[in-house]
Amino acid sequence: MQNRPIIIGVTGGSGGGKTSVSRAILSHFPDEKISMIEHDSYYKDQSHLTFEERVKTNYDHPFAFDTDLMIEQIKELLAGRPVDIPTYDYTEHTRSSKTYRQEPQDVFIVEGILVLEDKRLRDLMDIKIFVDTDDXVRIXRXIKRXMEXXGRSLDSVINQYLGVVKPMYHQFIESTKRYADIVIPEGVSNTVAIDLLTTKIAKILEEARNSK
């Protein structure tokens, strides 16, 4: 492993394709030590609240995340030390008692809707990516995902999108585009942008090896 891991931040609105872009990067480097860390793993522990209070959680607001812990653990990984990353129980709307061990890698993809919102987290990143997708495309994906995977009704998904997801996107997420080094319109279907990005990452990895 090289001396310091490369940290790549990938953000964008819910349903915008950031996870697909992250997976495209992962698949492009099958022989590298590369892992993805999701901001969603760091939703705050809400075990002190009643279930009725927990179900009202606004998961698209910065306050929902324990970003302090994420920053602390990324710093540990940068120092070459393993960490135990939390997991979140969406059924109970609180942090699970389970964790998973993340070993040091050469590259980490830090993915989530608000990973560019906190300057302390941005400052740890070598490449910052914003996946820019039209509202109409994002809501169509969100409806499909929530109805097929979570069994939710069309009305409930649309109401959540209009009442929470869309306003939070425009209040907190869209503005972080200005911090991005690379903006990828239309996500993973933009093969030119993906090719340019993976070429840049490969160059950074090669330079790191040659500097040893």
Swiss-Prot record:
User: Is Protein biosynthesis found in the keyword set?
Assistant: no
Q: Which reaction does it catalyse?
A: uridine + ATP = UMP + ADP + H(+); cytidine + ATP = CMP + ADP + H(+)
Its source organism is Streptococcus pneumoniae serotype 19F (strain G54)
| The organism's place on the tree of life at top rank | Bacteria
Q: Which NCBIfam families match?
A: PRK05480.1, udk
Q: Enumerate the Gene Ontology biological process terms.
A: CTP salvage; UMP salvage
- What does the record give as EC number? 2.7.1.48
Q: What class of enzyme is it?
A: transferase
Q: In which pathway does it act?
A: Pyrimidine metabolism; CTP biosynthesis via salvage pathway; CTP from cytidine: step 1/3; Pyrimidine metabolism; UMP biosynthesis via salvage pathway; UMP from uridine: step 1/1
Q: Which UniProt keywords apply?
A: ATP-binding, Cytoplasm, Kinase, Nucleotide-binding, Transferase
Q: Sorted alphabetically, which Pfam families does this protein's record hold?
A: PRK
**UniProt protein name:** Uridine kinase
Q: Output the InterPro entries linked to this UniProt entry.
A: P-loop_NTPase, PRK/URK, Uridine_kinase, Uridine_kinase-like
Q: Which family is it part of?
A: Belongs to the uridine kinase family.
